[in-house]
Amino acid sequence: MSVTIDHTTENAAPAQAPVSDRAWALFRALDGKGLVPDGYVEGWKKTFEEDFSPRRGAELVARAWTDPEFRQLLLTDGTAAVAQYGYLGPQGEYIVAVEDTPTLKNVIVCSLCSCTAWPILGLPPTWYKSFEYRARVVREPRKVLSEMGTEIASDIEIRVYDTTAETRYMVLPQRPAGTEGWSQEQLQEIVTKDCLIGVAIPQVPTV
């Protein structure tokens, strides 16, 4: 009788449990040793799901559109402007706002990982974390934006800002025509996370 040995799996890495299972096992081990304070996990869950939100960034943009003094502060010292609202925190210690103009479109990327200004943009979208976006937007931003549904005219410069270990960026988009007389609350509704990253432009709803 002959025996065939499959050598293809000899050096294969052992199968791993899903990340969620491993995380839960780690939590139970730490909790069993009394190393997890009461409410600690729930507190962070609330922070990530409710507090870290692009609604905060939209609030900053809406005020900048309607308050020239705040706009100037946001552009010269974004950290101080955000601190007025108490929106600082992890991944938001040093914030820089970059302004779109009729001749300039700004876009944010983190080419090394997926950092964003969590306190005012929320957690990064899946596409933002993808290698394809991180690799391509720095080389061909106009094409990438077009593929995402945002057409930028050829005579408009596109400037890409790469997040660093210290600096987190947000885009201050241009205020759309047709929003004259809108309240800050109304303006906030048209500013999305994609607008704050720079891959989309605020749109006025059509009736």
UniProtKB/Swiss-Prot annotation:
InterPro entries: CN_Hdrase_a/SCN_Hdrase_g_sf, CN_Hdrtase_a/SCN_Hdrlase_g, CN_Hdrtase_asu/SCN_Hdrlase_gsu, Nitrile_hydratase_asu. Heterodimer of an alpha and a beta chain. It comes from Rhodococcus erythropolis (Arthrobacter picolinophilus). Its EC number is 4.2.1.84. This is Nitrile hydratase subunit alpha. The gene is nthA. The modification Cysteine sulfenic acid (-SOH) is found at C115. GO terms for molecular function: nitrile hydratase activity; transition metal ion binding. Inactivated by nitrosylation of the iron center in the dark and activated by photo-induced nitric oxide (NO) release. Inactivated by oxidation of Cys-115 to a sulfenic acid. It comes from the Bacteria. Fe(3+) binds at C110, C113, S114, C115. Oxidation on Cys-113 is essential for the activity. Pfam families: NHase_alpha (PF02979). Binds 1 Fe(3+) ion per subunit. NHase catalyzes the hydration of various nitrile compounds to the corresponding amides. Industrial production of acrylamide is now being developed using some of the enzymes of this class. Belongs to the nitrile hydratase subunit alpha family.
